[in-house]
A protein has these predicted regions:
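N-terminal Rossmann NAD(P)H-binding glycine-rich loop of SDR-like oxidoreductase domains
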Residues: 3-25
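Conserved glycine-rich Rossmann-like NAD(P)H-binding loop of the short-chain dehydrogenase/reductase
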Residues: 27-41
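Rossmann-fold cofactor-recognition segment
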Residues: 49-65
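Conserved Rossmann-fold cofactor-binding substructure of NAD(P)-dependent oxidoreductases
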Residues: 60-78, 85-89
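ADP-ribose/adenylate-binding Rossmann-like module
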Residues: 85, 97-115
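Rossmann-fold NAD(P)-binding glycine/threonine-rich loop
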Residues: 109-131
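Adenosine-phosphate binding glycine-rich loop
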Residues: 125, 129-173
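C-terminal catalytic/substrate-binding lobe primarily of soluble NAD(P)-dependent oxidoreductases
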Residues: 153-408
């Protein structure tokens, strides 16, 4: 039997949500399966899913077993991989199996070293095999990546020019954190992994022949709280800006710099004013700093941080939300002397909290782009959501109930 989508790591916190969503929305249109190490856990999950999923195939797949990975990749259009925590020591064999079989791959990682290593090792091979490898396909980094892409695309269509700058801002967000995400980030901070230096380079995920721009920080010129002239709001650094900014800059490079060759890109979280911005920045810095030192790290793990597999309550996920707003500034003035601006928004509407329920939706719709609308996607390579999918992803997310639009 062949499958359109195989959900790998289906019994994890976000994997379960993805299976629920796939059963309710996409399962009737595509043959899909759930995969993982423990068939007993998979069977228990299947019993908890809606009636439409009662006949879904279960596959025993261990990410450490090369033959099992190759076997499932050979009979699948796209593997949707949630077997991370962290991805950098579990997902590369999955990417390799997909590339060797011409199978597409989707995940929700925000691990810059892993994404850089994946691109270095497999981009050329994936292009040759016509395998589309898509990382960071959840809240990290679809909203910012697609908002920037929509704004830059509209700038060219409306005003015939590239952008001098794009600023993304998380205008509103509410949700919780799962243990898997926290421990994945902890691994990036505390372990010596390949390409860790890419986290410190604003252009660390660009292709080898990429053209560096003016950015020196994830906020563009600074990571400190600041009044942003484009957003016309106070911004502080976003915890997700490290992978998200590098994803957007990689999108621009992969597409041939349609956003602008000298583009300045940055992002942040909207705050009421400078005081709240500094307090938020200091709190974030304290938390990150505490994770570096063994005694405080042990205390946080013991009494504060959730374990892998744990996450927000169902109520918190249902009530969660987010809005991301991109403002693009044209590279030159028009005949009237005015420099044009374009505003694009990504709104979760009723998709749920950003990190989990909405991430499940976005990652499944990304996988369905590859499974059901492959002809509208990029041919292959280690891509980004914007560079690999573009308008097809915008269309699917809008059809799924989110709202992605460019303001008139």
């Amino acid at each position: 039997m062949t499958f359109g989508v195989v959900v790998l790591g289906a019994t994890g916190f976000t994997g379960r949500l993805a299976c629920e969503y796939l059963a309710n929305r996409g399962g009737s249109k595509v043959a899909w399966a759930m995969a993982g190490r423990d068939l007993g856990k998979l069977e228990a999950l299947r019993k908890d899913l809606p009636e439409a999923a009662k006949e879904v195939t279960l596959l025993k797949v261990d990410v450490k077993n090369e033959e099992e990975l190759k076997d499932v990749a050979k009979k699948t259009k796209v593997i949707l991989n949630f077997a991370g925590t962290p991805y950098f020591d579990k997902a590369l064999p999955v990417v390799e199996a997909c590339v060797s079989s011409g199978c597409c791959y989707v995940d929700i990682t925000g691990e810059v070293p892993f994404m850089k290593t994946s691109a270095d090792r497999y981009d050329a091979k994936a292009r040759e095999a016509k395998a589309l490898i898509l990382h960071s396909c959840g809240f990290d980094s679809i909203p910012c990546d697609m908002a920037a892409w929509m704004a830059a695309t509209a700038m060219r269509e409306r005003h015939g020019m590239a952008c001098a700058a794009i600023r993304n801002a998380v205008m509103d967000a509410a949700g919780g954190a799962s243990g898997g995400t926290i421990y994945s980030g902890l691994g990036m901070l505390t372990q010596d992994v390949e390409n860790k230096a890419a986290m410190m380079d604003p252009y660390g995920m660009d292709p080898p022949d990429g053209q560096r721009g003016p950015d020196t920080a994830d906020g563009g010129t600074t990571d400190l709280p600041r009044w942003d002239e484009l957003q016309e709001k106070w911004l502080m650094i976003s915890p997700l800006s490290n992978p998200s900014c590098r994803t957007v800059r990689r999108s621009n490079a992969l597409l041939g710099y349609p956003y602008g060759q000298g583009l300045s890109y940055g992002e942040g979280i909207v705050v009421p004013g400078p005081v709240s911005g500094w307090l938020g920045t200091m709190a974030l810095g304290f938390m990150v700093g505490s994770l570096y030192f063994p005694p405080t790290r042990w205390a946080l793990k013991r009494w504060v941080l959730p374990e892998p597999g744990q996450g927000p309550s169902r109520k918190a996920m249902e009530e969660g939300r987010f809005t991301v707003r991109a403002v693009a500034l044209g590279e030159k003035a028009k005949s009237d002397g005015q420099i044009p601006k374009v505003v694009a928004k990504v709104d979760s509407v009723n998709a749920g909290d950003p990190g989990y329920k909405a991430t499940a939706l976005m990652s499944v719709e990304t996988a369905l782009c590859c499974a059901l609308e492959r002809g509208r996607c990029a041919e292959g390579g280690v891509m980004t959501p914007a560079a690999g999918l573009g308008q097809v992803l915008v269309d699917r997310l809008n059809a799924a109930g989110m709202k992605l639009e460019v303001e008139p």
